[in-house]
Every structure is written in structure tokens, then in C-alpha cells.
Amino acid sequence: MITSAAGIISLLDEDEPQLKEFALHKLNAVVNDFWAEISESVDKIEVLYEDEGFRSRQFAALVASKVFYHLGAFEESLNYALGAGDLFNVNDNSEYVETIIAKCIDHYTKQCVENADLPEGEKKPIDQRLEGIVNKMFQRCLDDHKYKQAIGIALETRRLDVFEKTILESNDVPGMLAYSLKLCMSLMQNKQFRNKVLRVLVKIYMNLEKPDFINVCQCLIFLDDPQAVSDILEKLVKEDNLLMAYQICFDLYESASQQFLSSVIQNLRTVGTPIASVPGSTNTGTVPGSEKDSDSMETEEKTGSAFVGKTPEASPEPKDQTLKMIKILSGEMAIELHLQFLIRNNNTDLMILKNTKDAVRNSVCHTATVIANSFMHCGTTSDQFLRDNLEWLARATNWAKFTATASLGVIHKGHEKEALQLMATYLPKDTSPGSAYQEGGGLYALGLIHANHGGDIIDYLLNQLKNASNDIVRHGGSLGLGLAAMGTARQDVYDLLKTNLYQDDAVTGEAAGLALGLVMLGSKNAQAIEDMVGYAQETQHEKILRGLAVGIALVMYGRMEEADALIESLCRDKDPILRRSGMYTVAMAYCGSGNNKAIRRLLHVAVSDVNDDVRRAAVESLGFILFRTPEQCPSVVSLLSESYNPHVRYGAAMALGICCAGTGNKEAINLLEPMTNDPVNYVRQGALIASALIMIQQTEITCPKVNQFRQLYSKVINDKHDDVMAKFGAILAQGILDAGGHNVTISLQSRTGHTHMPSVVGVLVFTQFWFWFPLSHFLSLAYTPTCVIGLNKDLKMPKVQYKSNCKPSTFAYPAPLEVPKEKEKEKVSTAVLSITAKAKKKEKEKEKKEEEKMEVDEAEKKEEKEKKKEPEPNFQLLDNPARVMPAQLKVLTMPETCRYQPFKPLSIGGIIILKDTSEDIEELVEPVAAHGPKIEEEEQEPEPPEPFEYIDD
């Protein structure tokens, strides 16, 4: 056994090359044991490598590499490993090889990324030996069928050739495509490179045996290429693949921005114009409202054209199909369907609100209860609680009245057809001026009803804002207009809001500053940024600054590194409100990206800024950046949640709420639990609200602590000595937990994995309730109905059932509160014992008379008890439209005997087009009527009695 390498090392000093070669071979065999001894003579080995006349110089490089590896000098080790050429075996499983390959890939990645950012002429050449090792590594991954690993390395090293090759060579091409698309959406931080990857994915998807148009369109949304989407839709209509076109339209509406959708609609309209002039088309002037009529017209045209001998292509069908697609893309269909779902399945427990109403004693909690009521009834159109408590509601004065009126907009969210009629009482009138707070609230409510789907209401709000003579009405009008025209970047709207901003009125300016951001959402409009930042630096009004702080951030929504220059300048500003704007801008620009640079910046500010508001905003903003990986958030903010600074603790609570919204994340709840007992009341408020955001729609089975928190909210609300701030948080938390009649969740990304713009905006503005309670209503933008809605070829809901393969209690509605009348009953029963005794006597007499009957009854009762003891079934059938929670989608299937087949997997949820495999007549789901005030003429008269014959005796 060798105890020293000194003898072998001495051979390196020999003149004979063969002896040196022999020494190197021996050293290579013992280097792992004697590297410390060999390291003293490593310079001799280096000299051998540098001697170009030496035959085994590559072997010298390998030994030197191993020595440097053991010394921890990985860079030198890598250089010599490259010099070893083929002697460095990438397929070897030793720790040395694994480490050097990792360093090699890191080094190669760094060079590739640096080159990618440089113009063509300035790119640095990459060492061919380095590339050779990486290529060998790729081949090893492919040979071992480690395709995901290869895709990951290919994307890191910007090797699109390898990326494409890996997908095509894999044994599961659709699976690899889905994996790559997910990586693109969640992890890729450079926009330019992401777009190149998406182009490759589009190419592969289109070249599949059966092109996957649904995923192609998801890629095209990211690429912001509405023209290509329009071309696909046009192609599908021509190929008579209408159902696929409809499905894509619904997916587009859910994932794309308003500007993108309007471009697609515009393209479809221009495509549709020649088709519209087909002779005999009777459908040109009609709005696609009454589908039955238009369908019957189509069949008539078909038969007519067939008789004359024309081809079916000449029929006027496409015009009607285009109209239907436009109706879907405009969001009209989805909003109507979601409204139907929420009205039909409304399961609000009014007892919760009644108990809260009876417990509150001041105006802040009164306002909170009104807001909580609107959350609970969001989109259900049910204003029953307000109608039952008009006297209590009338206590709201001034801005509380503004908030209460605006809450109707949340209740009637999406109820667009009758919006003006519903709100008529509260809107400004030419004749007699009403309460300014009520009128302002009414205009704000109209914006909430039409949020991100303005249409014609934008012009109405534009005129109302022009004619408003009062700053309160202008405040509501600006917010309403911003919501309705969200993301449209309309110049006339922008100019009017800018005029209102420049009036230098604090109340108007706050709303106008925020509304400017809403209208220019994600546009990165240089003029808008210049105007807003310029005015923010001039104005003396803190309120205007606050509005602009959020508005500026919204303009940079989703722009990632393009916002860096603005973020830098805002973060350096002397004004703390503008520094806070910088934090929000980071949150909006990088929302959902998980970008490490952005996280580092926010964490640095969270512990270093001198202003509490800025620190709080920085921590809150972490939630927006991490929401795609909610499991990471608790570890990032856990230390901040124990900070000595209460503002940082509050920010940590809200960050958890935002990031883990709707997930029921146990770690997040464990962090929030101690914060609900914080000595500082506003920290408790944040913890209570955040806990509701996380546990929305969770049941005791999916999240065991949900009932414990329900009781906590109730305890805080009913405790007379508790602080108003904590009570405000608890009341809002109750509203959030049971939002939308228990039928909505909060999610910052769409079902297809895109960042859901209205949700992100809604949650960001909601956090501003810290300064201004009426902004709480913005949370309604983030509520997403948890539904599966199946539609047939006519875009109607057929009667169909879905099978949920888990116990009904797993995702059941929470049990309603029991009416507390039991105690009174007990008192009464003890007071009338004599009567019960008499009743028992009578029962005994009956028993004697009807023994047989009683036996039967008892037997029946026993059967009932046995039935109750029966085990819970393992599945449940849900009727269309069905309430299906995100976690439940995994276990959702179509029953085997079902005549309908979904066009995309049920596990994605949302609105799904169903293909009918049967020729039988379909049964359709009857639409339900919305609640709310009705015009008197519309009320149905009682039906006349049935005809009868009067016989005079």
C-alpha cells in the first residue's frame, strides 16, 4: 500500500518523456488520496501541459485539473479540464466530473447571456472546448432520456437549436411542450429571449400532426401578436372547425389584455366585411343577441344554396360566426355566463352580516360592514341585506355614503345590460342636483360594474366627468372612468383625466392620478410617465401624490426590465411618496416574474429606508413578484414578519395574503397566526385580512384552521373593548372569506397561467385602503368565479353533469350559522311541563289504539337513522354550470355515459366548449333573472284564470 506520492512525483524531474508519462498515469490513479502532496509540485505538471512537444500534455492537464479541484480553485480546474480534451469524460459519475461540468455550464451560460445582450459586431468568441463539453452534456441528457434537464440547460445557455431538438426527440412531445411553455410563463426573466423561445414553440405546435391551436394562441398572447391569432381564427372558420375557434376566443378573453383583444376584433371585422356582402345574407345588421333566430336563418340559407347548386362556402354563415366570435372576444359572453353562475349558485349566509351589523357601534365599522356585504354578494346582484336594513344604511353620511353607493357596483359587477337603469337613482341628473357623495359613488359604481370592459359606458362617464361641477362627483367619475377604460390607452380619456389632475384639487387629483394609471395600464407611454412624474414633483397635495404614486406604477405594468430606469429615478427621489411609487413600480413591472434582482431591491429597501410607508410598500410588493411560486413567500418574509418595525410586520402579512391568495398555504397561515395577537392594532388588521385572502373558499378538510379563524373574526367584531382598526380588518376578512356567495376565489394568474391583469391591479389598489377606504372596492376586480361552464355549438348551456371524484364534504359550502333561538325554546319547554305530560298521556292512548301503525313508524325512523350513518359517497355529480374549486379540478371528469365531450381538459376549468356526440334534442339550462330594482312596466301582471264554463243552476 502506497503511503506517499513522493517517489512518483520525483519521476516528473526525469529527462525521459516515457517516465514522465508513466508518472502522470500513476499520479492520476492516486490524486484523490495524495492531492495535498502533489499540489506542492503542481507547477511541474503545469509545465508539462504547456510544453507543446510533450505527447501526453492532455494527461498532464487532467491531473492538474484534479489537483486544483481538490484545492477548491475551480476556475483553474475548469481551464485544465478543457485542456484535457477527450480525456475529461463527461459520462463519469465522480464528484469531480459533476462539479466541473456544473462550473463549465455556469461559465458557458454567463458568456452566452453576456453575448446575447451585445450587438452582433461586439460579441466575444466562446471557447470551442467549453462548447464541446456542453454539447457532450446535452447528448448525455438525451441518451439518458433526461429531456427536462436538457431543456433547462438549453434555455439557460440560450441554445435554441438544442431546445428545439430536445423537444422533437423526446418520447412525449406534447408533455415537453407543456413543460417548456410553463417555464416560459413562470421562470424566464428576459423578455427578448422569452419571445424567441415562444416563436420556437409556436413553430413546433403548428408542425404537429394535429396542430395545437389552443396553446399556439397562448404563446401568441405572450408575443403580443394579435394578427397571427386573427389568422388562426380565420383559418379555423374556413376549415369549419368552429368549436375550436370559439374555445380559443374564450381562452383569449380570459388571458389577453383589452388592447390585444380589440386588435383581434378589429382584424376579424375587416376579414368579415367581404363575407358580410354575400347576397341574401339577412344577418348583417343584427347584433348577435338572439342566437336561435340567426341559427334558423342559417339553415334556411343552406337549403336554398344547396337547391341552386352553390357550394356551402358561399352561405352567409361566416358572418354570423364572426359576430359570435366578436361577442366572445369582447367579453360579453363570459361576463353574462359568470353572472348567471353567480346568481344561480349564490350561497351567502346573511346571519354573518346580521350579527356583524348588530355588533358595530361606529362609522368606521359601519363602512366596513357595507364593504363586506358588497364582497359577499359580489356579482350576485343580490342587495337583499341593504334592502332589509335601509334605516341602518341611512346612517352613512358624507364619504361613507359615497362608499355605500359605490358598493352597489361590486354587488352588480358584470350586470352590464341594466347598469344605468339600476344606478339611475344615484347618478347625476340635469334637473335637480342630488347628494354629491351619492352621485360620485354612483359613477364609481358604474366603473366597478364595467371594470376592464367599458364599451359604451366609457363615453357616458366621459361626459359626466366633463360636466361635473363638484370635486366629490369628479372623484367618483374619475375612478369610474379609469376602471371602465382600463388598459385602453384612449387619448381623449387620458386628456380629460389630465385636465382634472392639473386643477390642483386634492380630492379630484387623487382619483385622477390613479385613473391615469388605469387608462394607460402597461402602455409604458413615455408622455404619460413624464406628465405624471413631473406633476408629482411639483404638487404640494399629499392626496394627489398618493394617487399618482399608484398610477405611475400601473403604467409600467408587466414591462419588466424596461421599467428599470424609471424605478432607479423614483427610488432616488427625496419625496418618500415617490420612493413608495418606486416600490409599487417594481411590483407591477416584475409581477409574477420571481425576478431575483427585483426581490433583492425590495428586501434592501424594506430594511434600509427611513420612511415607514416606503418600507411597508416594499414588503407588500414582494407578494406580487412571487405569486407564481407561493410556497417560496413564507421563507422570504418569515424574518420580516418578526421585525421590530410594525409597518414591516404589516407589510409581511399583506405580502403573504397577496402571494398565497386562495391557496390555503399552511406555512403562511402559521406565520399569520401569531400576528393576529400583535400588540400593534394595524398589524392585527393586516393579519386578519391576509388570512382571509389565503383561506378564501377553503373548507375544514382542505385547510383545517379555517373555522378557527372564522371564530376569531367573530370574537374581534363582538368584543366591545377591541380596537376599531382590528375590527375593520375582521369585518373585511369576513367579507373576503365568503366572497361572491362562496363562489369566487382570488388568483393573480389566469387558469392558463398568464398574469391576470385585473386581479393584479385590483389587489394593488385594494392595499391602498390604508389611506382611503373607498378603494377597498377594487378587490372585486380580483374575484374569479370558480366554475366549469359547458357550452354547446350554439353557445348555450346544455343540461349536463360533471363527476367530481372525491367526497362531497371536501369542497362543500360551509354550514350556515344557526339562528340563536334555542335558549328561548329551552326556557319555554321547562315552563310548560304539565302540558307535555298531558301530551304524553294522549300519545300512550294512541299507542294502545294504533299499535301496528306505530311499529311501522318506528321501523321507518330506524331506517332513517341507518341512512344517516351510511358512509359518505366517494364522488359527486355537479350540474352545469358547476361550482368547482381550483383543487377540485384535478378530480373532475365527464361521466362515461355523457353525450358531450369537452374540447379541452376539464382540469383547466372555466368556460369549456362541449362537442355533442348525439343527434337527440338537447335540454338547455334555463337562464335566471338578475336581482335589483326593475322598471315598473316590466313587472309581469298576474295571469288570467284558465277558461271555464259558467253554468247557471
Swiss-Prot record:
Segments of this protein annotated with the region Disordered: 279-318, 839-881, 930-953
Similarity remark: Belongs to the proteasome subunit S1 family.
Function: Component of the 26S proteasome, a multiprotein complex involved in the ATP-dependent degradation of ubiquitinated proteins. This complex plays a key role in the maintenance of protein homeostasis by removing misfolded or damaged proteins, which could impair cellular functions, and by removing proteins whose functions are no longer required. Therefore, the proteasome participates in numerous cellular processes, including cell cycle progression, apoptosis, or DNA damage repair.
Start-end of Acidic residues biased regions: 936-953
Gene Ontology terms: biological process: proteasome-mediated ubiquitin-dependent protein catabolic process; regulation of protein catabolic process
InterPro entries reported for this sequence: 26S_Psome_Rpn2 (IPR016642), ARM-like (IPR011989), ARM-type_fold (IPR016024), Proteasome/cyclosome_rpt (IPR002015), PSMD1_RPN2_N (IPR048570), RPN2_C (IPR040623)
Residue numbers bearing the N6-acetyllysine modification: 310, 720
Basic and acidic residues: compositionally biased ranges: 290-303, 842-852, 859-872
Species annotation: Pongo abelii
Pfam family, one: RPN2_C
Modified residues (Phosphoserine): 290, 315, 834
Alphabetical UniProt keywords: Acetylation, Phosphoprotein, Proteasome, Repeat
GO cellular component: nucleus; proteasome accessory complex; proteasome regulatory particle, base subcomplex; proteasome storage granule
GO molecular function per UniProt: enzyme regulator activity; ubiquitin protein ligase binding
Domain of life: Eukaryota
Gene: PSMD1
Residues bearing the modification N-acetylmethionine: 1
PC repeats: 403-436, 441-474, 476-510, 511-545, 547-580, 581-616, 617-649, 651-685, 686-726, 729-761
Subunit-level organization: Component of the 19S proteasome regulatory particle complex. The 26S proteasome consists of a 20S core particle (CP) and two 19S regulatory subunits (RP). The regulatory particle is made of a lid composed of 9 subunits, a base containing 6 ATPases and few additional components including PSMD1. Interacts with ADRM1. Interacts with ZFAND1.
Phosphothreonine found at: 273, 311, 830
UniProt name for this protein: 26S proteasome non-ATPase regulatory subunit 1
